[in-house]
Each structure stands twice: as structure tokens, then as C-alpha cells.
Amino acid sequence: MLHGDITSSNDTIGVAVVNYKMPRLHTKAEVLDNARKIADMIVGMKTGLPGMDLVIFPEYSTHGIMYDSKEMYETASTVPGDETEIFAEACRKAKVWGVFSLTGERHEEHPKKAPYNTLILMNDKGEIVQKYRKIMPWVPIEGWYPGNCTYVSEGPKGLKISLIICDDGNYPEIWRDCAMKGAELIVRCQGYMYPAKDQQVIMAKAMAWANNVYVAVANASGFDGVYSYFGHSAIIGFDGRTLGECGEEDYGVQYAQLSKSLIRDARKNGQSQNHLFKLVHRGYTGLINSGDGDRGVAACPYDFYAKWVADPEGTREMVESFTRSTVGTEECPIEGIPNKKVAHR
């Protein structure tokens, strides 16, 4: 894990994250113009960072947030499509991989159903290697149709990469799912706004540590007329320590080199903090001392997860018993979100 240079090597993957200023767009033509702006930025960045193997842009960086529902549906993309072809040309020209946001991607039943919030991982030949749809849209505000699966793909120089989006990263389950599938770098693209800056910086570092995984966060900056975005795009080592972090500046870039051999060695030889290994070898020292084998306990001890898989509706009812039974709240109603009406006093 190296920070401060502009290079990379056969062992290290040069990763850049961008504080992209949140655009405010309304038409397909504006979206495509903005995609070309991103493409130009990629080529320029490669000139300044010759070791850059992977460049990552935030959630909403291509489309901005379409606060008008009609505009959101009209500008929803297909994958592949016009936007991805612009990015493909830039990746080929700069000879880099890229992670790009599409908000949204047309649903299979478009326009009857809401679009997806989608990320793509594209290789240096302009080919889409991974397409991920946001599993946890930021309700009640975001109206995206939820995805249902994480993926791991071989990225530049063989580094194993998973994509997640913004609010996904508030749930430890998704980080663990990616890491346990073999991800060595988890990319979190977000369009996160104030007031949650401190929490999001902490979350990314904690999840890197807990999952023995590199984390790259690309976040929006600026003000789009509705929200103020805090930036702080960052690259974090698998030991939970920050390698490089932007401030709030528009178009800020951070860059670091992520070693393949180092993370693989740590996962193979780490002991007291090898969280992935220890989770399925629980208490092996005590079992060895008790004559009960030398590999620890593999079974999951967490009742919630077993119940959730076996009985999702029953688990939902259990959670509603100590939270609430409607998606909305009567004390802070949001238009279109059902809630219990306050009784007449």
C-alpha cells in the first residue's frame, strides 16, 4: 500500500478517486455532454498519473439527481448505451479501467417500473466487466428499483473488485458478502450529502478493517440546489488506515497504489486480525486446548441471519415489533410514503 507517487508496478494497481461536482441536468443531451466531460477528465488524469490503472467516479456523476420524476424516466439509460460508449472510448484512449454511475438504468419493464441505480466496471478495452444495481436505495428519498446481488470481477492486473453504492455501505452485511466472495477491493461510489460526513468517513475505514479489504470511495461535491455534498473521496488500506483523502473541493483527486501481494499475504498469514478466516474458525485455540479438533467452529452463531434466510416475512414482523409497521412516519410525513394517520384528539 503506497501513497504519494504517480506510478504503479506489476504488483500494484494505481487507483484514483474523484470528488466530482454534482451536476444538475434535465435532458438526455445534457447528460451526454456531461459524460463527455467525464471522458475528457479521464484522459487528462492519465497524463498526470501515468500509473493510473483504475479511475472511479461518484454515484450520480453522469446524470446528476433528477428531482423531476418525468426527467428521471426520460433520461434513464440502457446498458450498454450512449453513455457507456462515451466512457468506453475514453477508457480505450487512456488505457485505463473505470467505474461509472448510471442513474438510472432502465428497468426491464420500463417505463412501468422505476429505473435501477447502476454502477459499471469497464476495462481498458471499453468492455463492461461488472454491472451492479444498488441493493439498498436511500429510502424514503430515492425511488430506484432495488437490485438483489453483489458481484466480484477480476479487475486491472488481476485485482478482485466488487462495486457497491452509497447507502449500501451503511449495512455491514454487504461488505462481508463481497469480501467473503473474494473481493480484494470494494468500490463504494456515493452521492452523499451533509450532515452524515463523519459517519461515512468512519464507516469506510471500519469496513476496510473488519473485512481485511481495500476500500475506494468516490463521493460527489458541491451544491445542486437541494443538497450539499461533502466530497472526501478516499482510498483506504485493508488495515483500515487512510492512504489518501480529498477534502470538499470540486474535482479533487486522490491516488494510491494497492498491492496485490500484500493483501494476499495478509489474508494467508495474518492471525489475530484475520477477520475473514477467524469468522469460520471460531475459538480454535480453545477447541485445541479442549481436544475438540484444530479448526475451530464453522457454524454461524447468529440467530438473526438464520431466521432472515428461513423466514423473511417473519423476520420483518419481528423487526417491526420494535421499530414501526409502516414505511412512513406520521410525525414527519413525506409525500407518497404511507404512514399511520394521527388519531383525532
UniProtKB/Swiss-Prot annotation:
Belongs to the carbon-nitrogen hydrolase superfamily. Aliphatic amidase family. It comes from the Bacteria. Catalyzes the hydrolysis of short-chain aliphatic amides to their corresponding organic acids with release of ammonia. It holds the Pfam family CN_hydrolase. It catalyses: a monocarboxylic acid amide + H2O = a monocarboxylate + NH4(+). Its EC number is 3.5.1.4. GO terms for molecular function: amidase activity. PANTHER family: ALIPHATIC AMIDASE, NITRILASE C965.09-RELATED. It is an enzyme of class 3 (hydrolase). Keywords: Hydrolase. InterPro entries: Aliph_Amidase/BUP (IPR050345), Aliphatic_amidase (IPR023719), C-N_Hydrolase (IPR003010), C-N_Hydrolase_sf (IPR036526). Residues 13-260 form the CN hydrolase domain. The gene is amiE. This is Aliphatic amidase. Gene3D superfamilies: Carbon-nitrogen hydrolase. HAMAP family: Aliphatic_amidase. The active site is at E59, K134, C166. It comes from Bradyrhizobium sp. (strain BTAi1 / ATCC BAA-1182). PROSITE patterns: CN_HYDROLASE.
